[in-house]
């Protein structure tokens, strides 16, 4: 939507500029093209400036106690533009399975830094807040956007600190602030396989009695490689299914994690399975 609007505006401005100018013959074509490129780059710079200014006042050292409607609208506008620039052809299946009312825990396999962008873009009304590694808070603009979306940083090397993050996520769901999204492998898969899940994050669902939405994604690890070669990347995103809270009683988080793992692996296919030595 954003890129489309920018392109239309740039084209209109370019045509008007040339129509009001003194161009003739081939000069009309080259003049219009040059004006179009100039206006498009100008509009792109304005769009980036709006994002930068919006983030400039965000202080990530202060606790974020409320989800930002402004930043939700902002990412809803900008993410389709990012997907277009990166030539992502997102093929979403099973979205009708998402709970229509109430909060939930969303889990997905993790292949690329672009996975959260993909999920936010496909499910904008879900108000997803991600559990993320601490290093992501230091990324340019990204850390501030995450903060305003109530994303929670987790210390993967300290169990006590990690528990605090889990408890905060439980609190946010109980207070009906956001739904929580997490990559239960705990890290980006470097070999493309679906690695074993960390069962602790499933306690977010069992303690709050919310559904677990299982998603799988493919090919996001190839996006940057392909875009440098001007190639499109087909990105399948599947909502595999939903584990309902009625099935939780009498089961441990480990049991539920294993059920989710098995269903997601079945959807991804045998090429995502770990070697036997794992």
Predicted regions and their residues:
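Catalytic core of membrane glycerolipid acyltransferases/transacylases, capturing the structured
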Residues: 53-77, 84-85, 100-159
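A generic local structural motif
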Residues: 77-78, 90-94, 116-117, 166-169, ...
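Short, well-ordered coil/turn elements that cap or connect secondary structure elements
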Residues: 85-87, 125, 146-148, 175, ...
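Generic preference for hydrophobic
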Residues: 92, 106, 130, 237-239
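Thr-Gly-centered strand-to-loop micro-motif
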Residues: 93, 131-133, 155-156, 184, ...
């Amino acid at each position: 939507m954003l890129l489309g609007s920018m392109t239309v505006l740039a084209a209109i401005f370019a045509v008007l500029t040339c129509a009001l100018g003194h161009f003739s013959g081939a000069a009309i074509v080259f003049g219009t093209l040059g004006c179009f490129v100039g206006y498009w780059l100008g509009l792109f710079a304005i769009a980036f400036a709006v994002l930068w200014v919006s983030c400039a006042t965000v202080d990530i050292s202060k606790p974020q106690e409320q989800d930002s409607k402004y930043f939700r609208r902002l990412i809803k506008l900008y993410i389709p533009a990012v997907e277009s620039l990166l030539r992502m052809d997102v093929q979403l299946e099973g979205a009708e399975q998402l709970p229509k009312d109430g909060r939930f825990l969303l889990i997905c396999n993790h292949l690329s830094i672009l996975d959260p962008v993909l999920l936010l873009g496909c499910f904008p009304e879900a108000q997803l807040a991600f559990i993320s590694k601490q290093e992501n808070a230091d990324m340019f603009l990204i850390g501030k956007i995450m903060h305003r979306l109530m994303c929670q940083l987790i210390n993967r090397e300290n169990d006590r600190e990690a528990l605090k993050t889990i408890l905060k996520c439980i609190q946010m769901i109980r207070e009906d602030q956001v739904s929580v999204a997490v990559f239960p492998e705990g890290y980006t898969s470097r070999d493309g396989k679906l690695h074993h899940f960390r069962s602790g994050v499933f306690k977010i669902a069992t303690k709050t009695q919310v559904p677990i939405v299982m998603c799988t994604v493919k090919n996001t690890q190839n996006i940057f490689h392909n875009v440098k070669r001007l190639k499109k990347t087909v990105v399948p995103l599947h909502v595999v299914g939903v584990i309902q809270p009625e099935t939780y009683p009498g089961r441990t988080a480990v049991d539920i994690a294993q059920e989710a793992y098995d269903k997601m692996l079945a959807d991804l296919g045998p090429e995502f399975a770990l070697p036997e030595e794992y």
